[in-house]
Amino acid sequence: MKLDTVKIKGLFSRVLNNKMDGTDKADIQTYIKKVFGDGGTTPDPSMLHQFNNLVVEQADEIAKPKVTQLLSLLANVQQEKRGNIKEIKIPKKNKAKVIWSATGSGVDLVRVEGQETVPAVPKTMSTGFYYEPLDLVTDSIVYFNKLVNDIADAKVRLYLDKIHQLTASAITAGKIPAKNVQTGSNLTLQQYNKVASVLQRYGGKPIFVADTLLIDYFAFQQGTDSTFKNFLTEEVKGELLTALNPTTIGRTTAVNLTNPFTDDTNSKVELPVNKGYMFAGGVSQKPFSVVEYGGLRQLTEQDIEDERIKMKIVQDASVNLLFGEAIGIIEEQAAVSI
């Protein structure tokens, strides 16, 4: 037996946004107990499906600004309905063979910009998820918020996983110039700056996106490098001393990834901690194109052995690397690890 979807969606939204009114706390506890009982009984399949669908819808709403904020640094992001196919317009720089003035005399050659289009064919990205019904019944609001936010973060990581795969393949195939890549052991700030110097020619201040461990690795070299330490401002010194996430590395801006532990021993995380990406900031030509087809979806089953609720999170999207020359890859293979 399903309950009123619109009312439940409104309740979920108020709980997640800390805008609960008089009875909302009691209402969500009552609703969760209707779905899961005391946490030890088998949920009604239709109510469980409704609950998980609404949880994923709310997670998708939370994920949208996170995805947009992160992906906008490295990709042109577009939305499209499922079933449609979006055409990606790709600017192409071409030399004009001959350009004549009105009087017939020759003029200097110039670059003119044309366009070609390619179809953004969607692929299905997915990841697994599970939760314990007893947790939701015991502490409904805390675990409900955690469940929704964990799914939202999982969507962000779906895109990052795809970007990791694409860049690795592009490096192997030679689609990313060698000057844009620094891979090795005990990389120095000078090597980091070589990649930044390449990308700054595209315009804007380069942006480095990585795990906080890799950002710290390069950021703290600013205090010991024989050249950089002479140019450190008091502001940067203060940031290195007190900031949880340093944002300045030389002439680049650093942006740290959300990369939580995935095990109980704090020894594994979702994404590589030793690999980061650099992009030209503030320019329209981004290296990636992302077309998102529809929203996040889920498939549900309950494991009869451990009684966990298992979900498959699915997103259809087209993720393409269009301009390999506009991305930098930095991978430290020795000094940075969990």
Curated annotation (Swiss-Prot):
Organism: Bacillus subtilis (strain 168)
Name of the protein: SPbeta prophage-derived uncharacterized protein YonB
